[in-house]
Amino acid sequence: MREKYESLSAAVLRELAKSRGIKGISSMKKSQLVEAMLAQDEAEATETKMEEVEKKEEHTKERTTVAHRNRPASEGRREHRPSNEHHDNTRTERTESTADSSYAEEPKRCEGILEVMQDGFGFIRSDNYLPGDHDVYVAPAQIRRLNLKTGDILVGKTKRNNPTDKFGALMQLDTVNGFAVEEAAKRTNFEDLTPIFPNQRIRLEQPGSSVAMRIVDLVSPIGKGQRGMIVSQPKAGKTTLLKEIAKSVTTSYPDMHLIILLIDERPEEVTDIREAIQGDNVEVIYSTFDELPEHHKRVSEMVMERAKRLVEHKKDVMILMDSITRLARAYNLTVPPSGRTLSGGLDPAALHMPKKFFGAARNMREGGSLTILATALVDTGSKMDDVVFEEFKGTGNMEVILDRKLSEKRVFPAIDIAKSGTRRDDLLLNKEEQEAMEIMRRGMNGMRKDEAVESILNMFAHTRNNKEYIAKVLRSRMF
């Protein structure tokens, strides 16, 4: 069939796809049209086979019932047949039962994330949110009837109706995102929820926590629904800071669903984070630097949809992403050229999806929140990275700025306290904390950056917790 489609022109393929109801054909290339047609052929073949199996089973049941009713009473008292005839019948029954067992296997339990395709059908993915050999087909009728969406975690039963089927089909659905199927059908769409400013604080400070967490907790407080950026030069400690935030969240908020998304990252960093951050509600999703840009793009989109589905169930979700800059680079290589180019070779169209991802962070009035903390790279020697940062600069409502000059002087954490901060932090800090931060920021005026940070770090080191630090600042009226 592939050869037949490939022999046709793109215009003819487009007409065929249009007549079959395939969406988004105007932007597809010939190879994409061929794949879409083949995918629909496979989906239709699977549906047809499922219907045939159901009809065959119903017909067999009816025939058995009729034969049982019409059987004469004397037949039940008939003597045993000759041994050779009995042997032949037994052999025939065994052959039929063997064929039936290979044709329709026993249902198996399946669990994974749903990806709905353009043509309406879907697949349950299992490994790292990406296609694999053990994916499960979900029929369009099931998706429409149960209001299923990309990003839903489905638990149910599957089986192959034919040995030649590439994928098993979903036969029974038990839960959607851990909730009853009926609840999923009645949920409100993410886009219809009302976003408000973060007003519930996520405290990163805990007994025995590092100075970095104590500083971030006061200088750039994080609330549920925050959209924050960790701006860093190379080797300034952004990944370490992200890891410490993840540890604090898993310890203090075990019910919060934490997704760590690593894009274009080193494989050893992925292993380190997976082993360091563990919990019942923790997912580490990754796409290492040796993968194609399309792989980065697909993984990030699945993570975004997964988080939205959880928020629709009024869950609190946090995504820690490293990094938004590398995601923008991946989209710059995959989007169709718009004909315009910014400094550094960046296509403006490449920023749409990264902004959509980052902009999904919000606190919902109806309940639930999506918090996103993403790292952004600056001063890498690439003009494109600086342009990406400038484009995202005003979109967040919280920033932590790391300075490599401080780290080179062995000042850790290398946080530029003067430039870091949170919008509307009055909704998150109490009066004593606000007053102490005002005193601290006023005292930094006129001081060199490294001197000010060292002085503040010294004071943090001589206090056991933030409460003690605030009391000391308010008492002395200086830091």
Which residue stretches match the model-derived regions?
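Phosphate-interacting basic helix/loop segments used at nucleotide- and nucleic-acid interfaces
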Residues: 99-110, 211-215, 303-308, 357
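Flexible glycine-/small-residue-rich
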Residues: 114-118, 126-128, 140, 158, ...
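N-terminal "pre-motor" subdomain/linker immediately upstream of P-loop NTPase catalytic cores
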Residues: 75-79, 85-184
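Short flexible coil/turn linkers enriched for glycine and charged/polar residues
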Residues: 106-108, 116-120, 130-132, 148-152, ...
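Charged, low-complexity terminal tails
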Residues: 1-107, 120, 129, 134
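P-loop NTPase nucleotide-binding module
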Residues: 208-265, 304
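P-loop NTP-binding catalytic core
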Residues: 160-230, 236
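P-loop NTPase catalytic core
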Residues: 237, 246-249, 258-280, 284-479
